[in-house]
Structure formats: C-alpha cells, structure tokens
C-alpha cells in the first residue's frame, strides 16, 4: 500500500523583521569584505519599534558607516513611510560592535596561510530531485510565493501590499514523491483601507497562480489568506527582528537536519556559513552526478582545527553504490578545509546580501557558487557509474 503523508515548509518576505535583520547584517559584511577581503566579521542585528541595534565583533582595516548601511537596507526593503510602522529616516541606530577576541583570531589565522575553523560546529547539506534546482518542493514553492509578494508590491501590481509577509506550503507525498500542493497559507501586511475579499482574491490571482504550476494545485486545495482577517501593523512595529532566527527558512524548510548555526553577518571563515555552503555543494553534485536520488551531507569542525573532524553522507537508500563509497569520494574530491572551501567557492566577495532573503540554496544566481554542479562528472568517473 502506498505511503502517503503531508509535509510543510515556510518562507518569509524581505520585509519580515527577522529577515530585515539578516539583510542588515549581511549588508555590513558585504561593505567590509569588499574593502578588506581578509576581515573577520560577526555582525548581529536587533530591530524593534523604531530602532536598530548592531552588535558583534570585527577585525578589519576599513571603516564601515553603520548608520548609513542600516538605513539604506531598510529603505530598499520598502519601509519608507512612518505609516508602515518603521521608517528608514527616523529609526534610531545604535552601533555596539567591538573587536574580535585575539584568542579566537590566533586559532583561525595559522602559519602557512592555513585557516582554522572559526568555531566548532556541525553543518548539513541536502539535495534531491524534487525540483530542477535539486531542492525540496515545499520550500521552493514557499520562497517563490514570498518573492512574488515583494515583486507585486514593488512593481505596483498590488499597491496595497506592505513589506512584511509570510507563506507556507503543504505538499502531499506518495511513496516519497511530491504529488500535489494541498494547502497554501499567505499572510501579508497591507494598507488599512483594502477589503479582505479584494486582498484575498488578488493574492490568489496575482501571486499563487503566477508562480505555482497548475498541475501541482490539488483539486481540493485550501487557501488561508491572512487568516486572522487583518494585517496592518507589521515589520519591527509588530514583532522584534533578530539575525539568525530563520535558519530553517534559510536552508531546506525542515526537509533535513540543521546544525543550529545561522549564516548572516558571518565572514566565510565561520564554518557555520561556509561549511553549510560546502555541504550543499557536495550534496547537489552527488545528486547531479546520478550517484543517488537524494543526499544528506554532514560536516563537523573543531575551532582552530583545519580539517573537518567528520564527514557523513546519507543517500536515504537511493544510491548506486554504498554510502561509504560516497563518503570516500567526497573526501578525495572535495577540499573541505575552511581555506579550501573559501577558494573553491570564491567566498571572499561581497555576495552575501543577496543570500539573506528567499533562501541561501536553490537559487542559481552567478554569485551562488555552491549551486554549481561542476563536480558531477568527476564524481561519476570516480564512482564508475556512467
């Protein structure tokens, strides 16, 4: 008998307060790393009603105009009017960033140009054949919905929308394969004078139907559009925002484990970020090579230690060879030292603001080098699976 279940993932718009915090942290990182590629950055942002606080640690030779960066990000997101509950012009900005501890730095910067891991930790990467970008279907569709909410707002298609918003997608699986979308939840901030029925109809017509393929929509699909009935107060006025509080949205929507480390505001010597990008790169290339239909990759590090302390590959029973051979392949073909990851993926560039909304994985932008499948042929040759 066919095994059937429902699986749900969510995404949030760039105007969600937690995502605002992520984008501010990464905008600061980009500004610094563009001028000082060897900088060490750990930048955290807190947003609340009318103010932003920047905290963390830096080791850099450059100066970053924190207030200007923060205000520009808020403006670009769309908080340009006090009526929205947050305004880039009037928001207070407090800079509490300090210097990086020399105790940490001596373990990261090592003799001979080697880089030790910036902290201990474990990271996961994942890939599967549910979508053309080798990502799970629920998180892929959720991201497309939230991105279209922002597009419709910025392009004036739905001028009554405001920046804050969320989407959630529930997918029916049969024997492990996605079949239909059964439920879509969308909550979007809006002007106070738009009627509920107009908003609901417009969101389904201009957002859902525009990005969700018709063949995926179940005949009995349920839509929950602003299910509370009203969403005028939003953004940092409605909820505080913090860097690193949307780690499942940032990754795979719950389809695989998460090591717990956030990404935004961290330079690539922090393996929370670069290790997770490398794990995605490995997993995606394993699947693209034809070695397996699905791959979960775990990498773990110790602070100040160059080589990973462990590498694990789980093909979920879909591989053409034993998982031990996949692990040997990964060890032989991928340099998973912090320095090796930074070099392979070209991570000392100002590319991080783009990652901070709508997912770090599954978007094949030129800057997202971890999405390339340039190792697939090498893997298939190594495993002799052609």
From Swiss-Prot:
What does the entry list as the binding residues for Mg(2+)?
Answer: 18
Gene3D superfamilies attached to this UniProt entry: 3.30.300.10
Cofactor stoichiometry and binding?
Answer: Binds 2 divalent ions per subunit. Binds 1 potassium ion per subunit.
GO BP of this protein = one-carbon metabolic process; S-adenosylmethionine biosynthetic process
Could you tell me which InterPro entries the record lists for this protein?
ADOMET_SYNTHASE_CS, S-AdoMet_synt_C, S-AdoMet_synt_central, S-AdoMet_synt_N, S-AdoMet_synthetase, S-AdoMet_synthetase_sfam
Catalysed reactions listed for this entry: L-methionine + ATP + H2O = S-adenosyl-L-methionine + phosphate + diphosphate
Q: Which cell locations does it reside in?
A: Cytoplasm
Q: Which GO terms describe its molecular function?
A: ATP binding; magnesium ion binding; methionine adenosyltransferase activity
Q: Where do the annotations place K(+) binding?
A: 44
- Requisite cofactors: Mg(2+); K(+)
Quaternary structure note: Homotetramer; dimer of dimers.
This chain belongs to which protein, by name?
A: S-adenosylmethionine synthase
**Species of provenance:** Nitratiruptor sp. (strain SB155-2)
Q: Tell me the gene name.
A: metK
């Amino acid at each position: 008998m066919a095994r059937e279940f429902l699986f749900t993932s969510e995404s949030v718009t760039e105007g969600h307060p937690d995502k605002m915090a992520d984008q501010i942290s990464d905008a600061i990182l980009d500004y610094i790393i563009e001028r000082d590629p060897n900088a060490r950055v750990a930048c955290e942002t807190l947003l609340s009603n009318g103010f932003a606080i920047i905290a963390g640690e830096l080791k850099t030779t450059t100066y970053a105009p924190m207030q200007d960066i923060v205000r520009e990000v808020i403006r670009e997101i769309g908080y340009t009017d006090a009526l929205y509950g947050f305004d880039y012009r009037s928001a207070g900005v407090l800079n509490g960033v300090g210097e990086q501890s020399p105790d940490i730095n001596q373990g990261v910067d090592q003799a001979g140009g080697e880089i030790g891991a910036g902290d201990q930790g474990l990271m996961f990467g994942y890939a599967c054949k549910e979508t053309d970008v080798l990502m799970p279907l629920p998180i892929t569709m959720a991201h497309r919905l939230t991105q279209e909410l922002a597009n419709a707002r910025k392009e004036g298609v739905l001028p009554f929308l405001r920046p804050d918003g969320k989407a959630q997608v529930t997918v029916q699986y049969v024997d492990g394969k996605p079949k239909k979308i059964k439920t879509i939840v969308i909550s979007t901030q809006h002007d106070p004078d738009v009627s509920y029925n107009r908003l609901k109809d417009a969101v389904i017509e201009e957002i859902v139907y525009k990005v969700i393929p018709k063949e995926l929509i179940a005949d009995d699909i349920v839509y929950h559009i602003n299910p509370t009935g009203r969403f005028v107060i939003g953004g940092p006025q409605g909820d505080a925002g913090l860097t690193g509080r949307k780690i499942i949205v940032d990754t795979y929507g719950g389809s695989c484990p998460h090591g717990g480390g956030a990404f935004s505001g961290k330079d690539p010597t922090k393996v929370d970020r670069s290790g997770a990008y490398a794990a995605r790169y490995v997993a995606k290339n394993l699947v693209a090579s034809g070695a397996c239909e699905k791959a979960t990759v775990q990498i773990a590090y110790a602070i100040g230690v160059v080589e990973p302390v462990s590498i694990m590959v789980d093909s979920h029973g879909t591989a053409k060879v034993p998982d031990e051979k996949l692990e040997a392949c990964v060890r032989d073909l991928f340099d998973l030292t912090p320095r090796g990851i930074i070099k392979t993926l070209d991570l000392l560039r100002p590319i991080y603001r783009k990652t901070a909304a709508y997912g770090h994985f599954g978007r094949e932008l030129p800057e997202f080098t971890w999405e390339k499948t340039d190792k697939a042929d090498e893997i298939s040759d190594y495993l002799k699976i052609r």
